[in-house]
């Protein structure tokens, strides 16, 4: 039962990691778009004729990309916090599983010790009874 809980927590953490990687990839795409937009804007300034509408469109798109990048960075930060919490839950679940394993091993050792003690006592009783008969 505890092992199922551990597996569930690990699966949840894995899903968060996948989501985080996707978000980081999307942020990188936004950064690349910003770079390309900046290059296109600079190339517009070097043309013989200035197209104000295109320049304004690139500036507006650049501002949108900045906002998108900031939002994505916030989402990534929140996802990292969520991942840290989930990793803590995984560690706690793993700790519980290990404790139960150790407890089970200890109980098995105690059982076998009691079994062997009972067997030794029976052998001693049989041996004692034999000597008493002779």
Q: Where are the language model's segments positioned?
A:
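Charge-rich amphipathic alpha-helical interaction elements
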Residues: 1-134
């Amino acid at each position: 039962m505890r092992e199922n809980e551990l597996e569930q927590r690990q699966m949840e953490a894995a899903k968060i990691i996948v989501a985080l990687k996707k978000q980081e990839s999307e942020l990188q795409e936004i950064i690349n778009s910003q770079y390309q937009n900046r290059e296109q804007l600079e190339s517009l300034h070097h043309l013989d004729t200035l197209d104000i509408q295109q320049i304004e469109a690139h500036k507006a798109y650049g501002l949108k990309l900045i906002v998108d990048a900031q939002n994505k960075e916030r989402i990534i930060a929140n996802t990292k916090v969520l991942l840290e919490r989930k990793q803590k839950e995984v560690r706690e679940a793993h700790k519980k599983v290990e404790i139960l394993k150790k407890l089970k091993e200890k109980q098995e050792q105690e059982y076998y010790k009691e079994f062997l003690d009972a067997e030794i006592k029976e052998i001693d009783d049989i041996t004692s009874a034999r000597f008493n008969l002779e």
